[in-house]
Amino acid sequence: SEGGHPEDSINCIVMAPTRELAQQIDQQMEGFSYFMPVSSVAVYGGNDGVLFEQQKRGLTLGADVVIATPGRLIAHLSLGYVDLSRVSYFILDEADRMLDMGFYDDIMQIVKFLPKERQTIMFSATMPAKIQQLAQNILHNPAEVKLAVSKPAEKIVQAAYICLSLIHI
């Protein structure tokens, strides 16, 4: 694969607290990577055995990006066929929500499978003590970026333009 990363290994893990968010991230990933040689697999719970087998196949073949919920990724890890030793990027989306849902121990269990040398990114709307504790445990020399809302959402104008001709004058 490009960038020196082996094709049969997982390069990036994006953790999401819910199946719905994992599906949404996966859909966006498919859109972003449409014209690029980037593969992704979404790994989330459900009662579908076929889905579990599809996820297993994606994990064992090696996807560039794995989008996963903590519980389902641990289920696959516990079966012993998932290799996370070459993960370069570990991303926690909505980390505060994951902790609110009781996933702290699951996240720490997943981290044990990851290489020490990796980039970890944590997104959180809030920074309560438990998020700060998680950050201390899994981040090394972190940089904190705080974003303030610059405009109320209702003041943002969204527009779509339709080009009636491909000829530029």
Each model region followed by its residue ranges:
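SF2 DExD/H RNA helicase N-terminal ATP-binding lobe
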Residues: S1-L166
